[in-house]
Structure formats: structure tokens, C-alpha cells
From Swiss-Prot:
Residue positions with a glycan: N30, N83, N100, N104, N123, N179, N199, N234, N323, N597, N622, N660, N757
One Gene Ontology term, aspect cellular component: extracellular region
Keyword Glycoprotein in annotation: yes
Protein name (database record): Probable alpha-fucosidase A
Signal peptide per UniProt: 1-20
Enzyme Commission numbers on file: 3.2.1.51
Record-level Gene Ontology MF annotations: alpha-L-fucosidase activity
InterPro entries: 6-hairpin_glycosidase_sf, 6hp_glycosidase-like_sf, Alpha-L-fucosidase, GH95_cat, GH95_N_dom
Task of the protein: Alpha-fucosidase involved in degradation of fucosylated xyloglucans. Hydrolyzes alpha-1,2-linked fucose.
Keyword terms, alphabetized: Carbohydrate metabolism, Glycoprotein, Glycosidase, Hydrolase, Polysaccharide degradation, Secreted, Signal
Taxonomic path: Eukaryota, Fungi, Dikarya, Ascomycota, Pezizomycotina
Family: Belongs to the glycosyl hydrolase 95 family.
Predominant location: secreted
A Gene Ontology biological process term: polysaccharide catabolic process
């Protein structure tokens, strides 16, 4: 990174900089407040949360595929799809809505038996008896290495513990060591379920927990803990009932934890009878644990750290520490955080968001759910499922831009294997089309693609269009044409095919445009009914979906010219979903019926501003439209008024950032941290449990928008070779003065790094554009105020 010498020197003298790379506390977490006090570990598939208790440690354990319900509870499970088609009701629904402006879709609603839920796997217990005279305690989660540690003294004995979850070895590892000798240690696996109760057994130096979520047909799950005592001659018979007991006197003990289920997403199709069932996991888990236990602790840790840092270190953000916060426990910093803010904490949570994504999304895992990977509950809020009218999307907002694009494979596989097969049936049974696929707002891991029973939140077939935005983003940043042809484009094309079949001429305004009918804004009106036509959110999404089909046509390798012609034809008359209403707002519906100061948590009518681009890029220079965006944001409130969610605030922060309104962007960001982030850094839905991870990831996205404006461009601009204008530092607050960023990915390929002065104005930059293809447009960089800046040297 190029930083001008005088600027860097002045910043170093003016403000201290501290690497905000660890969460720490001088006291253990609280078992009764596990989800707000424990520090999380993960390798994509496996999750662990050590509480850090002195002598009776509890580590909460998760495996990402452990769900009850679906075909593991009933052979009649259908993904919510009806037995017979309901599509015959659509013409009448549409006619009524065009005649009256609003209507309902009650004929399309359905029940969702056997939907199921994500659930906790077990607790690992580590009992060292009664310890006294505890002194010098500290626990720490190092974000640089993804290693948890704690240490303390008990009398003359110093005890240190470390834990991590390794992607290369597919296990979590926990180690205890001492300067003299460890007390007797009893290791156990516990699960409180009684119906059906799992079987816990011990053999040699291993504990196995084996269970099923439902009698006979339930999902099989297996967890194994293998204990290793380096240098000891007795490691073959450590069992005591169903626990492993290591005698007093050892200096080092470590264990490996492996787990799996018989869930198999690739069997979620008609060929496999939508069984989602794979092989019994017992032998695989046994082999994984056995292989890992043969390695030394140092070898396991070394491969884990090398793998993790190979991803995490692709991006850096450095903000100042004006308050000397690095010297205070982060649990205190987060508990006492208040506006106007603390750059050290904001930097910490940015790094933490990237850490959490690496820990919950790895090739071969499921994508992060509403709680990422971590739950201590048998029945987490909203089933710990996948909500896709903002939450799943927000989880992936900043992934590609911050160097984590290679970790998105779980999302594409999940969509292709659990949404598309069942979603093709849903398209036919609810919407009368054999073209493409559709799903709705709430999904499990068993292909639940049908509409649930409350229209206000269940009627959301636009999930396929919004998730196609993420398909395009991944291609745009990576420029991986092979991935786009083989994986991304089939998802996007199927969504576009569905919407080609559903667009109808506007018979209310009779303006010749194509609109969606029926629709409603996510979890919002316009009425209690609550369907209407031409919803802004839908129209913007479909406009961008069709635009991406055309923009990526060459890269797709598709020779289906009839499909392309259909897209081109309907794109030309599609209502783009940008209407300015009677009080200067971006209308939420084509009908101008928005209520001023409606502080609903969603910003659905501003999708095209952020994270979309039809407003921000295509019409971003139109002051009438940008004024309407501002009016809408002020009217919508701060996100406190409706449910006080963290995700609503960081969405607002990102929108303000793209308007270059720094004070509002920073205010919303700091408000989210103040109101919603617990002492362990997890985002709490309304400021208290339940935990919902979207704002952890969304905060990263919002901060990226404060750092850079690199909006997507329309297919027309791209084909015309229009220069890609990138604004560095659209909304950097003065509190972050003298900071820097390294490794920001650019659309079309390339990386930019830059630093800024004490006022938040970028004064030095360096770009590496070698990854850009010859057919990608040129990039020009600007700073606040519209001044061009040379990033070439």
C-alpha cells in the first residue's frame, strides 16, 4: 500500500493505532447467558463455544446440518407444496387486484408441516474438580489466528487452555497444559434430549454420542471426542463409565472433536425421492477423529492457522484508537459502547464479522443461517432457518469485496441442491409455469420452497431474483467465467425464466408496462390484505435480474437465443420500480399510498439504492431521485422504532453512506453497536436474545460502503464501454481519521488500497488492476468532492 510519508507520520503522532484483532475478558462467560458471553469458534461445519469456566468448563457444540423435520420426520414431507395445483386461482387474484388496487393471495397460502428446526448438538464438559485461589484469569479470542485461549493460576499451578476448529482436519481441538501438573480431568459429552435420547458410550480414549432426531426415520447424528495424553504410556483405557478420565499429574492433554449427520443435500431431488439422506456418519466420524488424534497438537494448530490466515489476511482495515481502548477488556468495551462511537470497537467488529463468516462458511458446509452456525438451543428463534427477504442476503453483502469470495460455495450449492429442484415444482403448482424455479421467504435445509400461511411475510417469490444479485456480484468481482457458466448462470437463468412467465401488463394504470401481480413489500403492506401490483422492490429486482442476463450473456456461454430475445423484449417494457410520490418519496408501491413517517424496519423500496444499483448507479446523478432517496430514509426512521433490529440500522447506514451523508451513516452504525451488540460481539435481534447474525455481517457491508462506492453498472453502460467510476471514501467519519484499508476488491476485477487524512479524505492510493479482463471497462478513481486521484503508482 502506498502511503504518503508526511501524512502517515502526522497520523502516527496524532492518534495511537492499535490492532483490533482480539476479543478478551478478565472473567469467564456465564452459562445462563451462553449466547451473549461465550466466544465462538467454527470451521464451516462444526461450531464450538467455550464458556471459559475455571474448573468445570462447558463447550457448546454444533454441527451445521443437524436439523429435525422434513423427510427425517415424515415420508409425506413435500417442501410445503400442495398435492394439486393452486395456479388456477392466479387469474382471478390478478383481475381483482387490477380492478381494486389491492387484494389477497389466500388461495395460494399453505401449511408447513414437518418444517423442522436447526438444533444444538451437545455440550463438551471438562471437569477439573474444585480449584481454589484463582488468580490472573484472562480469556481471549484471537481473530488473527482463530484460536481461543484462557489462562489462570491456582496456587502455584499455572493452567493454560487453547481451542480452535480446523478446516483442514475437519475437527475442533481443545488443549490443556500446565507449568507443573494438571489435576485429574474428566471429559464428557452431554445432550439433554430424552425423546429420543442419544446413546453416549466410551471406549479406550474416545467418547461417542450417537442419536437420532426422530424414531426410526430421524436424522442420525454422531459426535466423537478422542482424548490424547502426549508422552503418557496409558492412553488406551481411560474410560470411566461414559466419560474419559485423565489421572492427575499430566502436563498436557488435548482432545479432538469430530461430528457429522446423515444429511445429504445432493439427494434433495426427484431422482433421490427428495430424501436428503446419506450414509450413516459413524464410520466417517470415527475415521476423522482417529486421523486427527494421530497428529501432534502443534501440527494440528499449525495447519489450522496457516489455512485461516490464508483467507483472513487478504484484507486489512486499520482505524485509530483515540480512547486507548486496546487496554480494556472488549467485553467491557462492547457493554459500555455508546454514541458517538469508538473507532477501535468498530474496527474490532469489522474484523469479527469477517472472522465469523470464515468460521461459518467453508466449501462443503451449509451457508450461515440466521444464527450463523452457533446455537445453544434445541429450538432457536425462527428455527434458526434461512430468511431471504434481507437476512441471508445481508450475510453475504461484503464477502466478495473483502477477499472472502472463495468461501461462497456453500451458498451456491445450497441454492442449487435444496431450492431449485423443489422450487421447480413450486413454480408449477403455485404459479402455473414449467419454466424456472421459485422459493419464498423462509427455507429450511430440506427444500421448503412453497408459500407459508401468512401472506404479509410468506408471499415473497422474489427470493430467486434477489439471490441472483449475489450470483452476479460473485462473478463481477471474481471474473471467474468458468464458475459463472457452470454454477452461477444456471441459478440466475432459472430465476429469470420464472419471472418471464409471471410478468403481466399493467391493467390498472394501462401505461403499457409489465408488472408483477400479485406482490407485497417484504413483511409490509400496503394494506392488511396485503397484496397489490407493481411493488417497487420486485420491479427493481427483476429489472436488475434481466439486466444481468444481458450483461453476462457472452460469459454465460448460453446459445438459447429465444431466451435472450424474450429477456430483451420484456426488459424494454418492464416497469423499473422508480416512482416519486406525493411527498417526495421513492414509492414503495406503484400506487402512491405510502404513509409518511412509516418507520417500518425494511427498506424494500430502496433496494435499488443499496444493495442494488438501478437507483444508485443508473440514476445516481439525478438529484430529484437522490433527494427522494434521502426523503425516504428520513421518513423511515433510525431502525429503533420498529423492532429495534441491528440489521435495520446497518442497512440504513449503508444507504446514507452512498448518499455521502457521513454523519447519518456513522450515527446508524454506532447506534446498531450501542443497541444490539452483546459483550461477545454477537448481534441481538432487539437488543437482547435471540441472537441473529445478519447485522454482524451487515456491519461489515455498511462500513465498506463508507469506505468505497463502486456500484454495479447497467448492461447499456457496460456495452458502451463507459468508464467505471470508483469513489474512495464517500463517508469516512473524522473519528476514523488517519486510517487505511488494504485489499478492497473492485467490480470487474482488481484490488485497491488507500489511506486518508485526519478529516477522512483519501490522500493516497494504489490499485492493482492486473486481474481485469481485456473486455472490462477502464477504472477512474475519485475522492470526496469529485477530485480525481491517481492510484497507478
Amino acid at each position: 500500500m502506498l502511503i504518503s510519508g508526511s501524512s502517515a507520520a502526522l497520523c502516527a503522532l496524532a492518534l495511537p493505532f492499535a490492532a483490533a484483532k482480539s476479543l478478551w475478558s478478565d472473567s469467564p462467560g456465564n452459562y445462563s447467558s451462553f449466547i451473549t458471553t461465550a466466544f465462538p469458534l467454527g470451521n464451516g461445519r462444526l461450531g464450538a463455544m467455550p464458556i471459559g469456566s475455571y474448573d468445570k468448563e462447558i463447550v457448546n457444540l454444533n454441527v451445521d446440518s443437524l436439523w429435525r423435520g422434513g423427510p427425517f420426520e415424515s415420508p409425506t414431507y413435500s417442501g410445503g407444496n400442495p398435492n394439486v395445483s393452486k395456479a388456477g386461482a392466479l387469474p382471478g387474484i390478478r383481475e381483482w387486484i387490477f380492478q381494486n388496487g389491492t387484494g389477497n393471495v389466500s388461495a395460494l397460502l399453505g401449511e408447513y408441516p414437518y418444517y423442522g428446526s436447526y438444533q444444538v448438538l451437545a455440550n463438551l464438559t471438562i471437569d477439573m474438580g474444585e480449584l481454589s485461589d484463582i488468580d490472573g484469569y484472562r480469556r481471549n479470542l484471537d481473530l488473527d489466528s482463530a484460536v481461543y485461549s484462557d489462562h489462570f493460576s491456582t496456587g502455584e499451578t499455572y493452567i493454560e487452555r487453547e481451542a480452535f476448529c480446523s478446516y483442514p482436519d475437519n475437527v475442533c481441538v481443545y488443549r490443556l497444559s500446565s507449568n507443573s501438573s494438571l489435576p485429574e480431568i474428566t471429559f464428557g459429552l452431554e445432550n439433554q434430549l430424552t425423546s429420543p435420547a442419544p446413546n453416549v458410550s466410551c471406549h479406550g480414549n474416545s467418547i461417542s454420542l450417537y442419536g437420532q432426531t426422530y424414531p426410526v426415520i430421524g436424522m442420525i447424528y454422531n459426535a466423537r471426542v478422542t482424548v490424547v495424553v502426549p508422552g503418557s504410556s496409558n492412553t488406551t483405557d481411560l474410560c470411566s463409565s461414559s466419560t474419559v478420565k485423565v489421572p492427575e499429574g499430566e502436563k498436557e492433554v488435548f482432545l479432538v472433536f469430530a461430528a457429522d449427520t446423515n444429511y445429504e443435500a445432493s439427494n434433495g431431488n426427484s431422482k433421490a425421492s427428495f430424501s436428503f439422506k446419506g450414509e450413516n456418519p459413524y464410520m466417517k466420524v470415527l475415521q476423522t477423529a482417529t486421523n486427527a488424534a494421530k497428529k501432534s497438537y502443534s501440527a494440528l494448530k499449525s495447519s489450522h492457522v496457516k489455512d485461516y490466515q490464508g483467507v483472513f489476511n487478504k484484507f486489512t482495515l486499520t482505524l485509530p484508537d483515540p480512547n486507548g481502548s486496546a487496554d480494556r477488556p472488549t467485553t467491557e468495551l462492547l457493554s459500555s459502547y455508546s454514541q458517538p462511537g469508538d473507532p477501535y470497537v468498530e474496527n474490532l467488529l469489522f474484523d469479527y464479522g469477517r472472522y465469523l463468516f470464515i468460521s461459518s462458511s467453508r466449501p462443503g458446509s451449509l451457508p450461515p443461517n440466521l444464527q450463523g452456525l452457533w446455537t445453544e438451543s434445541y429450538s432457536p428463534a425462527w428455527s434458526g432457518d434461512y430468511h431471504a427477504n434481507i437476512n441471508l442476503q445481508m450475510n453475504h453483502w461484503a464477502v466478495d469485496q473483502t477477499g472472502l469470495g472463495e468461501l461462497t460455495e456453500p451458498l451456491w450449492t445450497y441454492m442449487a441442491e435444496t431450492w431449485m429442484p423443489r422450487g421447480a415444482e413450486t413454480a408449477e403448482l403455485l404459479y402455473g409455469t414449467s419454466e424456472g424455479w421459485v422459493t419464498h421467504d423462509e427455507m429450511n435445509t430440506f427444500g421448503h420452497t412453497a408459500m407459508k400461511d401468512v401472506a404479509q411475510w410468506a408471499d415473497y417469490p422474489a427470493t430467486n431474483a434477489w439471490m441472483s444479485h449475489h450470483v452476479w456480484d460473485h462473478f463481477d468481482y471474481s471474473q471467474d467465467s468458468a464458475w459463472y457458466r457452470e454454477t452461477g448462470y444456471p441459478i440466475l437463468k432459472g430465476a429469470a425464466q420464472f419471472w418471464l412467465s409471471q410478468l403481466v401488463k399493467d391493467e390498472y394504470f394501462k401505461d403499457g408496462t409489465l408488472v408483477v401481480n400479485p406482490c407485497n413489500s417484504p413483511e409490509h403492506g400496503p394494506t392488511l390484505t396485503p397484496q397489490t401490483f407493481g411493488c417497487t422492490h420486485y420491479q427493481q429486482l427483476i429489472w436488475e435480474l434481466f439486466d444481468h442476463v444481458l450483461q453476462g450473456w457472452t460469459a454465460s456461454g448460453d446459445d438459447d437465443t429465444s431466451f435472450k430475445n424474450a429477456i430483451t423484449s420484456k426488459f424494454s417494457t418492464l416497469d423499473p420500480g422508480i416512482h416519486i410520490g406525493s411527498w417526495g418519496q421513492i414509492q414503495e408501491w406503484k400506487l402512491d399510498i405510502d404513509v409518511k413517517n412509516d418507520t417500518h424496519r425494511h427498506l424494500s423500496n430502496l433496494y435499488g439504492w443499496y444493495p442494488g444499483y438501478i437507483i444508485s448507479s443508473v440514476h445516481g446523478s439525478n438529484k430529484t431521485i437522490t433527494d427522494a432517496v434521502e426523503t425516504t430514509l428520513y421518513s423511515r426512521g433510525t431502525g429503533v422504532e420498529d423492532s429495534n433490529t441491528g440489521w435495520a440500522k446497518v442497512w440504513r447506514s449503508a444507504c446514507w453512506a452512498l448518499l455521502n451523508v457521513t454523519d447519518e451513516a456513522y450515527s446508524e452504525l454506532s447506534l446498531a453497536i450501542q443497541d444490539n451488540f452483546a459483550e461477545n460481539g454477537f448481534d441481538m435481534y432487539s437488543g437482547s436474545p435471540p441472537f441473529q447474525i445478519d447485522a454482524n455481517f451487515g456491519l461489515v457491508g455498511a462500513m465498506v460502503q463508507m469506505l468505497i462506492r463502486d456500484s454495479d453498472r447497467s448492461s447499456a453502460d457496460a456495452s458502451a464501454g463507459k468508464t467505471q467510476d470508483v469513489l474512495l471514501g464517500p463517508a469516512i467519519p473524522a473519528a476514523w481519521g488517519g486510517g487505511s484499508v488494504g485489499g478492497l476488491r473492485l467490480r470487474g476485477g482488481g484490488v485497491v488500497s488507500f489511506s486518508w487524512n485526519d478529516s477522512g479524505v483519501v490522500d493516497s492510493c494504489k490499485a492493482d488492476l492486473s486481474a481485469r479482463g481485456s473486455d472490462v471497462s477502464q477504472v477512474k478513481f475519485y475522492v470526496a468532492g469529485g477530485r480525481a486521484i491517481d492510484c497507478s503508482s
